[in-house]
Curated annotation (Swiss-Prot):
Cofactor: NAD(+)
Family to which the UniProt record says this protein belongs: Belongs to the deoxyhypusine synthase family.
Key words of the record: Hypusine biosynthesis, NAD, Transferase
Enzyme Commission number(s) of this protein: 2.5.1.46
Binding site for spermidine: 136-137, 243, 288, 314-316, 323-329
Full protein name: Deoxyhypusine synthase
GO biological process, one term: glucose homeostasis
Broad enzyme group: transferase
Keyword Transmembrane set for record: no
Length: 369
């Protein structure tokens, strides 16, 4: 190459390969994974995720974000801060951070149900949002079990056998027959109370009633009823519950569910929150319903998304938290986190590093109430 001395590498190649770096910000963390020479310490292992990189680092940041929600939630309020007439509908006292938990139905079908039940049982979250399946699958599990299967099982053969597949989970169709037998008398009673007592049913009131009627401590909604945690399900008819309501409408017509009252309930929970945090597992209606409620307060203070959806198709499910910032659904000064992962892998670990670490503090708070 012209101008290059004999025996020397081309200067342009040297300049390109050996380009000098600018200094990184002094607070930059070094990549460091867990050293198993320390033995098996799961808390230390998960703490090391913060500096591992990729989605492990996002998980570590999600732990920090949820712990920030909990820290603010457990802070005592001033005497004049917890009186808002609009919040009396849910019968829940205001805390330093109102935590919204959203999850799709498949997670209740899976063993994540037990993780969610733990949070609700111990009054660790304030508002639940799910789909019809996220309600009915919890109740059905109190009547009959769901089984492990394989993703590869053929739909035609399963249908001929009366077996429904949810990923690698199997639900015998007899479970839904048992659900119908249990639900129909409750729907009859709801219609009676509507007609004779003027009860105005909403999806959240119906779910609370079902939680009371199931009377089983394995149920998420048993504990939601006991702890006055509202459960919002704007798509409550989109599932087996809807099927049963449809069949019941022929036998005993007239049941009315008011979604507008529930809309006011969730929006006021956000509006009057001192701070708000969103933990959203999956996407679709549960993700947007919580985010849109937080628009009413110019955005959530904290947000954690866990899902595998991508943003390239413009879907709400795949949208990153920064898109919600543009809509005013997450605050501009927030530090939201999205973990690109299957929630069945990640969420129990997240709870282990956050809520479960503060179990005694939550019990103490409940005893004070």
């Amino acid at each position: 190459m012209e101008g290059t001395p004999p025996g020397a590498a081309p200067s342009s190649a040297l300049a390109a390969v050996l380009k000098h770096s600018s200094a990184l910000p002094p607070e930059s963390a070094q990549v460091q994974g867990y050293d198993f020479n320390r033995g098996v310490d799961y808390h230390a292992l998960l703490d090391a995720y913060r500096t591992t990189g990729f989605q492990a680092t996002n998980f570590g940041r999600a732990v920090q974000q949820v712990n920030a929600m909990i820290e603010k939630k457990l802070e005592p309020l001033a005497v004049d801060e917890d009186h808002h007439a609009d919040l009396t509908q849910s019968r829940r006292p205001l805390t330093g951070c109102t935590i919204f938990l959203g999850y799709t139905s498949n997670l209740i079908s899976s063993g994540i149900r037990e993780t969610i039940r733990y949070l609700v049982q111990h009054n660790m979250v304030d508002v639940l949002v799910t789909t019809a399946g996220g309600v009915e699958e919890d109740l059905i599990k109190c009547l009959a079990p769901t089984y492990l299967g394989e993703f590869s099982l053929r739909g035609k053969e399963l249908r001929e056998s009366g077996i429904n597949r949810i990923g690698n989970l199997l639900v015998p169709n007899d479970n839904y027959c048992k659900f119908e037998d249990w639900l129909m008398p409750i729907l009859d009673q709801m219609v009676l109370e509507q007609n004779t007592e003027g009860v105005k049913w909403t999806p959240s009131k119906m779910i609370s009633r079902l939680g009371k009627e199931i009377n089983n401590p394995d149920s998420v909604y048993y504990w939601a009823h006991k702890n006055h945690i509202p459960v919002l399900s704007p798509a409550l008819t989109d599932g087996s519950l809807g099927d049963m309501i449809f069949f019941h409408s022929y036998k005993n017509p007239g049941l009315v569910l008011d979604i507008v009252e529930d809309l006011r309930l969730i929006n006021t929970q956000a509006i009057f929150a001192k701070r708000s945090g969103m933990i959203i597992l999956g996407g679709g209606v549960v993700k947007h319903h919580i985010a849109n409620a937080n628009l009413m307060r110019n955005g959530a203070d904290y947000a954690v998304y866990i899902n595998t959806a991508q943003e390239f198709d413009g879907s709400d499910s795949g949208a990153r938290p920064d898109e919600a910032v543009s809509w005013g659904k997450i605050r501009m000064d927030a530090q939201p986190v999205k973990v690109y992962a299957d929630a069945s892998l990640v969420f129990p670990l997240l709870v282990a590093e956050t809520f479960a670490q503060k179990a005694d503090a939550f019990r103490a708070e409940k005893n004070e109430d």
